[in-house]
Amino acid sequence: MTAFRTVYPDIIGAYEKIRFSTKNLPESQFLYGEQAPEPLLVTENGVQFATYLNEGLMTGIFLDQKEVRGRLVDGFAVGKTVLNMFSYTGAFSVAAAMGGAVATTSVDLAKRSLPKTTEQFEVNHLNLAPQKIIVMDVFDYFKYASRKGLSYDMIILDPPSFARNKKKVFSVAKNYGELVKDSIDILTDKGTLIASTNAANLSLAKYKKMVITALQEKNVRYKITDTYQLPADFQVNPNFPEGNYLKVLFIEIEK
């Protein structure tokens, strides 16, 4: 810690995240300097996000997705209805709303997603009326939306690499194709799918193949218009390509 403080003397305050299993240490703890206010409001692409630096491993926003959120803020979602699956704190939804989306729907199984997402809209002074925040299993919501005849101009998929609940075990490597197929069922006839994963054990080539296979099985016309990986300020060791874990595809789909 002495060496860190010597190299980075301008750090106002520091928190530690414990990413290995331990019985004696918390996932997160304050180390030195000034403690951040809660929430700590950070600004990205002109959008404010409420973050909590000492709330477990996650802070409320994943900075590696800033370029994708920037596209949404810059008008990619203007005039569109947006469905944000595995929405966490709703960062994609807020970015889309700030960029002119007419309505957003955020779906996540975690109960905390409701107050967390509401807060993100509120700190940006956005009207909550056209923003739906739903606590539900994503696969159950696909069935619900299909049964109710709901459809969306844009669907964002950003699942965890692995997740488990009472009904299902999900892994990107085995189940991502299901997400793509279910999305197509409730996408408008000419819609956009933003497909994302942070699975480090899956190369970009294999990920693209997985997504394309699902699209072909649904017999739709599609075009991958943009591909994103980690932003330039996220260092990647060329000898460890798995470190460039983020993979995001922008796909235009016509049914």
Pin down the residues of each PLM region.
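Conserved alpha-helix/loop element of class I SAM-dependent methyltransferases that forms part
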Residues: 63-80
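C-terminal catalytic and target-recognition region of SAM-dependent MTase-like enzymes
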Residues: 178, 192-255
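S-adenosylmethionine
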Residues: 138-214
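Conserved SAM-binding motif I beta-strand of class I
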Residues: 103-108
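S-adenosyl-L-methionine
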Residues: 112-156
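Conserved class I S-adenosyl-L-methionine
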Residues: 78-88
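Conserved SAM-binding loop of SAM-dependent methyltransferases across substrates and taxa
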Residues: 89-101
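Non-catalytic substrate-recognition/targeting regions of SAM-dependent transferases
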Residues: 1-62, 70
